[in-house]
């Protein structure tokens, strides 16, 4: 039962609570985002290496981002950008899994590790502690948008129970949260609603005053409507507009020009703003680890190249991620939520003959915001062509350590 679950979780944590109460949002740019056109434009390099669209100034003296990140540039003093992140793997599946796991020996993604240590559900709200937000989670209109969650949500050697909760799958968990019943069971539905109404009146009249702490908590979870977290309709329209990426469209003729053009419509970033808003809501309600996916970053030129992909995906990430940072600050959550922006690897320093860049594991995209970390800094630097780290190498294990120290109060 739910009261038993809550009591068990509390007992397990008595005297040994190592949780910091913070959350992590991992924005995973699937396909391998170019490190050059994002956070390391290298405009002093030869033309075939430097950022294709130039650079934009930031609030940090002498630091520039790629030209499609002007909003993030204005928030650079609230970010920590890494220009020396390297793991050496240039294969999609294994590199994505490596980054998602932070190289830990169980090969479980960091969200699963968190759930293993913190529990499957938040002890107070009942919300899953490890949640995946793909475009389809934002509604049926986004069901055809691409996502490859299997690469970044492996439980490795841990039990499958620690798999990320995916609200887009129509799982029984979300249905239970929403108290749905199949069509045709009207009498059962009416009976259930009547019983819930009676239960609410009973609670309102103080009838649960004598219940155990965990029975009361269970009442609050059921009657409080945990599923409301997944409904954006009560959000301030001004913030909805600030996050919104629905206006960013793929040019109609672009897919026909490409060898693998049929894949391009699935890369639309129109849901990304809503995904990031959902991530904030989840963290605000107690979810400890949220993974947000955004695809299309494999910019060889067969589908998207850097030349035609960055003008679409870049502004979407810029708007959604900057809105997330500003929203967290407005709500007093900046110290409580760590945003991590990364992908499976970077892209080749030299632009290819299709207007794209190919796989490159020797330098990768990585940036942070919030979480109580030191912001307003650039960590490490790349060499003159953004081919490899030139100082302060950052590894997968360091990424894992940063995330785990944010989530847990543990020694080095």
Task: Annotate each language-model stretch with its function.
Residues 1-412:
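Ligand-binding pockets and gating/stacking loops
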């Amino acid at each position: 039962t739910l009261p038993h679950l809550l009591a068990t979780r509390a007992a397990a944590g008595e005297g040994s609570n190592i949780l910091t109460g913070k959350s992590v949002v991992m924005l995973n740019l699937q396909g391998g985002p170019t490190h050059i056109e994002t956070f390391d434009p290298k405009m002093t390099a030869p033309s075939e290496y430097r950022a294709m669209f130039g650079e934009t100034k930031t609030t940090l003296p002498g630091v520039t981002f790629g030209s499609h990140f002007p909003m993030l540039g204005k928030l650079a003093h609230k970010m920590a950008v890494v220009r020396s992140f390297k793991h050496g793997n240039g294969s999609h599946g294994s590199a994505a899994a490596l980054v998602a796991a932070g190289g830990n020996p169980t090969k479980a993604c960091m969200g699963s590790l968190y759930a293993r240590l913190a529990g499957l559900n938040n002890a107070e709200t009942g919300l899953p502690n490890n949640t995946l937000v793909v475009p389809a989670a934002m509604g049926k209109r986004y069901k055809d948008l691409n996502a490859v969650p299997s690469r970044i949500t492996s439980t490795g050697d841990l039990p499958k129970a620690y798999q990320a909760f995916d609200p887009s799958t129509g799982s029984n968990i979300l249905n239970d949260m929403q108290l749905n019943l199949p069509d045709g069971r009207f009498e059962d539905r009416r009976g259930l609603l009547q019983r819930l109404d009676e239960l609410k009146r009973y609670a309102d009249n103080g009838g649960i005053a004598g219940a155990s702490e965990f029975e009361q908590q269970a009442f609050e979870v059921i009657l409080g409507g945990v599923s409301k977290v997944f409904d954006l309709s009560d959000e301030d329209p001004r913030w909805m507009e600030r996050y919104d990426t629905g206006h960013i469209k793929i040019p109609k003729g672009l897919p026909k020009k490409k060898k693998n053009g049929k894949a391009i419509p699935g890369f639309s970033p129109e849901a990304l703003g809503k995904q990031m808003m959902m991530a904030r809501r989840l963290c605000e309600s107690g979810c400890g680890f949220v993974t947000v996916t955004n695809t299309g970053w494999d910019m060889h030129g067969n589908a998207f190249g850097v030349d035609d992909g960055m003008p679409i995906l870049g502004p979407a990430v810029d708007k959604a991620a900057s809105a997330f940072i500003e929203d967290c600050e407005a709500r007093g959550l900046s110290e409580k939520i760590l945003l991590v922006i990364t992908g499976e690897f970077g892209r080749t320093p030299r632009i290819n003959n299709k207007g794209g860049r190919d796989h490159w594991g020797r330098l990768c995209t990585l940036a942070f915001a919030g979480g109580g970390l030191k912001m307003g800094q650039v960590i490490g630097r790349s060499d003159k062509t953004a081919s490899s780290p030139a100082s302060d190498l950052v590894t997968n294990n360091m990424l894992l350590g940063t995330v785990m120290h944010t989530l847990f109060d543990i020694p080095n």
